[in-house]
Curated annotation (Swiss-Prot):
This is Olfactomedin-4. Pfam families: OLF. May promote proliferation of pancreatic cancer cells by favoring the transition from the S to G2/M phase. In myeloid leukemic cell lines, inhibits cell growth and induces cell differentiation and apoptosis. May play a role in the inhibition of EIF4EBP1 phosphorylation/deactivation. Facilitates cell adhesion, most probably through interaction with cell surface lectins and cadherin. Glycans are attached at residues 64, 128. InterPro entries: Olfac-like_dom, Olfactomedin-like_domain. Residues 174-225 form a coiled coil.
Length: 505
């Protein structure tokens, strides 16, 4: 626009000069004789003009343009423009290039967003792998060869993704480089774990598989004259040599009152006349871990699993988790005392309430880690039992066989095992089995007392548990299972017996 303005100003100046010169010349011709020489003509130039050269033209410079009038009075103007005109075509190309670059930037930016999301996803997977590897480091027995293969496969997938990101990503790759280093470290760690295998778990398992194969071959080729392995004892029978092992726990259900009710007991009612009866009872204590106020009955295990078809009852006099059911009766330690109460499961009425002679109560000699269980009631194939301690026994376990109808004591045995050092106990075929805590995940059946022979001794049967504390253990003679109340969860264990009956001494 500035060049156009300059051109117009120059043109106006030239036209103005020419018109004034013409008027002046005409006026001079009217008043005087026209000059015959260039010198005379020069006298009539406009004010501010320069002298005209003889026989030629005189230029009048103004800014960056010049104007002149020749000898005939004709105005001539010249305007000095830049060497090149305004580059409109180059500006248009620049705008087009900028548009193309903007589109490319948008595409690359969208890729960056996708990469960021992918990095976030794989970062979470990497954290998950880290946790799994840490678990494998802490508990080497829990992992398998398949675990290694799955982890290595996932790490390889992440390595491929990182390489793809580095190939396609333009700009700073600092985050991707860090992720690649972490994945490389994870790969080395998994390979190190697999190669070290500190407990030789994988090699041992391979050897076990090989041994099992050989064992099957031996069994297939052995003579038919070899007598078969004797079957397990019949339900409710004592034709065996005692407990020699125990299965892994089966989690049946959380107690019906919820996770906060960590203390209590549960089991299956046993009746020698009707051993197949499937009446299950659950008796969680109140949150004070002392008072037994409510219990629930289920007619089958299926109903217990889905909390269906149950009967709820309320009592106000139970104490501790030493409860047991026998012959359609519930036996409990009476609240704040040394009595035992017999409650009819059909009517919820107390039929008998009788003191257990000399029994300590109210946490005098309770189990380790469990309060208010000074008196623990138990059932086996033979009778109803009371497991407790007295001042006369100096806290050692006392076993009494009870009349399940009158609650009178029939026989009593005093052991050498201190009751507060025991975490819990149960009876099988007249033999007391006591447990102790090894750690937060393991109990041990470490002690037994046989009332049939009055012999006692040590055992080493490990017993896994789901939670830290075991509150009660009840044995059922017909299904030969332990019913364990473990921090609010209802667990089942199968007992394994020695096939050869124990010889009396």
């Amino acid at each position: 626009m500035s060049y156009s303005l300059l051109f117009l100003l120059a043109l106006q100046f030239c036209l103005g000069s020419a018109s004034r010169t013409t008027l002046t010349s005409a006026h001079s011709r009217e008043l005087t004789t026209p000059p015959t020489s260039p010198q005379a003509t020069a006298a009539w130039l406009p004010p501010g003009g320069t002298s005209w050269a003889e026989g030629g033209t005189v230029s009048q410079p103004l800014s960056n343009f010049t104007g002149s009038v020749d000898s005939h009075g004709t105005c001539q103007c010249s305007v000095s423009l830049p060497d090149t005109a305004f580059p409109a075509d180059r500006v248009e190309r620049l705008e087009y290039t900028a548009h193309i670059l903007s589109q490319k930037f948008e595409r690359e930016f969208s890729k960056v967003k996708e990469y960021v999301q992918l990095i976030s996803v794989y970062e979470k997977r990497l954290l998950n792998l880290t946790v799994r590897v840490e678990v494998m480091e802490k508990d080497s027995i829990s992992y398998t060869e398949l675990d290694f293969e799955l982890i290595k496969l996932e790490v390889k997938e992440m390595q491929k993704l990182v390489l793809q990101l580095k190939k396609n990503f333009v700009g700073s790759t600092h985050i991707i480089d860090m992720l690649e280093v972490e994945i490389r470290n994870m790969t080395l760690l998994v390979e190190k774990l697999e190669s070290l295998d500190q407990n030789n778990v994988l090699s041992i398992r391979r050897q076990i598989l090989a041994l099992k194969t050989k064992l099957k071959e031996c069994e297939a080729s052995k003579s038919d004259l070899v007598p078969a392995t004797p079957p397990p004892p019949a339900p409710g029978s004592c034709s065996h040599g005692g407990v020699v092992n125990i299965s892994a726990p089966s989690v049946i259900q959380l107690n019906w009152l919820g996770f906060s009710y960590k203390y209590g007991a549960w089991g299956r009612d046993y009746s020698p006349q009707h051993p197949e009866r499937t009446l299950y009872w659950v008796a969680p204590l109140n949150t004070d871990a002392r008072a037994l106020e409510y219990y629930r009955l289920y007619d089958s295990l299926d109903n217990l699993l889905i909390y269906s078809h149950f009967r709820d009852y309320r009592i106000r006099y139970g104490q501790g988790g030493g409860t047991v059911a026998f012959n359609n009766n519930l036996y409990v330690n009476w609240y704040n005392g040394g009595n035992i109460a017999k409650i009819n499961l059909t009517t919820n009425v107390v039929d008998v309430n009788r003191p257990l002679p000399l029994a300590a109560y109210n946490n005098r000699f309770s189990y380790a880690n469990v309060n208010w269980q000074d008196i623990d009631l138990a059932v086996d194939e033979q009778a109803l039992w009371a497991i407790y301690a007295t001042e006369a026994s100096t806290g050692n376990i006392v076993i009494s066989k009870l009349n399940d109808t009158t609650l009178e004591v029939i026989s009593t045995w005093v052991t050498k095992q201190y009751k507060p050092s025991v975490s819990n106990a149960f009876m099988v075929c007249g033999v007391l089995y006591a447990t102790r805590t090894l750690n937060t995940k393991t109990e041990e059946i470490f002690y037994y007392y046989d009332t049939n022979t009055e012999r006692e001794g040590n055992l080493g049967i490990t017993m896994r548990k789901m939670q830290e504390r075991i509150q009660s253990i009840n044995y059922h003679p017909f299904d030969q299972k332990l019913y364990v109340y473990n921090d609010g969860y209802l667990l089942n264990y199968d007992l394994v017996f020695l096939q050869t009956p124990r010889q009396p001494v």
